[in-house]
Amino acid sequence: MKRFVWIIGLICCMTCIIQAKDRVIERPPFLAWSSNSIEVDKIVMSDTVTTVYIKAFYHPKYWIKIATGSFLKDNNGMLYPIRRGIGITLDKEFWMPESGEAEFQLLFPPIPENVTSLDFSEGDFDGAYKIWGIQLDKDAFYKQKLPKEAVVHKINKKAILPTPKLVYGTATLKGKILDYQKEMIKQVKMHIESPALNIHNEQNIIKIKEDGTFLAELKVVSVTSVALEFPFGWIECLIAPNEETSLIINTKELCRRQAHLQRKDKTYGEPVYFNGYLASLQQELASVDINIVLKSVYYMDMYNDIVGKSADEYKAYVLERLPSIRKEIAQSQYSNACKELLNILVDLDATGKIAMTERELKSAHIAVNKLNREQTDDYFYNTHIDTPKGYYDILKEFSSINTLKALYGKYYASTIYLISFLPDSQKVLEETLGTGQGPLFDNIKFNKLYQSIKNFSPLTTEQHAELKTFSSPVYAEMLNQTNKEIIKKIELNKRKTGFTVNEAGQVSNEDLFPSIISKFRGHTLLVDFWATWCGPCRTANKAILPMKEELKDMDIIYLYITGETSPKGTWENMITDIHGEHFRVTNEQWSFLMSNFNIQGVPTYFVVDPEGNITFKQTGFPGVDTMKEQLMKAMNK
């Protein structure tokens, strides 16, 4: 018996010794991630295996997947390929439960004791999960100091919101990403929300240097709201002509605040530090925790709420929170300048929602009743939504939209776009605002002229005369400069090659698509249904340029089909930079193609094999990796 007890004791001691060797890091801090769908709950490191405990947070009844090519990389550059999963099968769809939360483990080879941090990556494909700088030494991590430029500015509570200047000049945006690793991101999209540029939200690509710094310069006529789209979050800021805005981006704090597991942990400072143009106001805006969005619900939930409602009932629905938001802003501790801007943002949001009354009520009916394309067109164009007399009088309460200060608003350009859906918009605005003059009217007029130029239609004699009607000469200055640039580009486009304009010919609608692709039978085709006015189409066309270059020796033909909604002049000038075979079909032909192939929007892509079979179809850009994979499959059938 004593011997048995002794053996049991020895086993327990050995077990304790073995367990003592295990190194456990609970909820390790990290530098940045590409998605907050998966989080590291714990890492257990032994002599034989490294176990990463994962908690997943994703939409219920949607799936996530962990790739077999996943790996850990330590701070010395050593790679540790994944062995297997526990609770999840690699490369297999893992369906999220109703709770939207799940747990599983990922097993990797043992990690040396001298390693201080790890990167997790699924690989270098679109949508890959990546977590950079997972810290194995918490104490050392928490002792890290921020650079001296990362300062929190003192807020003057009595400060008033300055009136923006109208000057055509260069705005400078510079920044630095703290703890940057070149694997994180090599460039960032800058979304420009400015009526002085493009109501459809133009994008600039900013390259990031190896030290994590970046610089962008942009011609603007006044204060302009921009948003930087990073994989670890969006960052909004203001830029202005002849001014410099400087950002210090603290990724570890930015991600911590998004995390489910570490949201209540010790902070690492502010997510973003601002210097330069209106730094204290920008800092204050970034810290606002008041939800000023009038209706922040999933669009189908809203459609279910408003379907069948009258215009007045819709108005009451979308403005339900307006009084409480106003009250919360008034009672907040923010500066007078910040409060004024928050109220302007509310005015812009409310104006946009009221302007969209007819469109939203129709869209709700179409979506909830699941109308087909023919029924949708009939209902949308032949149904009248009654708006009672005086319905739009409420816009008088939102008169700040016709002031220069409204240019601070990140919704300003979007609101101008939404106003275009308002029946008799010019007349309604003049009646409700009591004037046909002011910054709002200037910018509405500016957009029409700017868009005409950007669509490769240089200013006419009449439009040149219209430039004199602006309240400030800066608008004419920018339009004239843009006009000169487009004329120069049109001339350059005449010399470009690499694209072919094709005629669809006189064929029946049923024979149209077979006729189009018959010319290219024997080749693998990537067919792109697109439009010149479609922002995602243009973005995707740029995104696949490296793939086109990589596959240039393959037997692949790129075929582009658009309709008459793409203005002919715009189309002719755009396709000079889109190498491939181009078709512009009639409205009737386009409608048939959309209906026959059940195409719900653009861009829509087909992959067609050499025998003429459609092997892949998707609306929305699927990503370069998926596109390439589907083309290779079609070629190798």
Kindly give the residue locations of the regions a language model identified.
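Short, well-ordered beta-strand segments enriched in hydrophobic/aromatic residues
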Residues: 49-58
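Short, solvent-exposed, Trp/other aromatic-anchored flexible loops in extracytoplasmic proteins
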Residues: 81-118, 122-125
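A non-transmembrane, solvent-exposed segment enriched in polar/low-complexity residues
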Residues: 86, 133-336
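Oxidative protein folding and maturation machinery
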Residues: 163, 251-523
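Conserved helix-turn-beta segment immediately C-terminal to the redox Cys motif
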Residues: 523-524, 541-561, 629, 633-635
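Conserved redox-active cysteine motifs that mediate thiol-disulfide chemistry
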Residues: 529-546
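Conserved segment of the thioredoxin-like fold in thiol-based oxidoreductases
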Residues: 549-590, 595, 599-602
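Thiol/disulfide oxidoreductase modules built on the thioredoxin-like
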Residues: 588-632
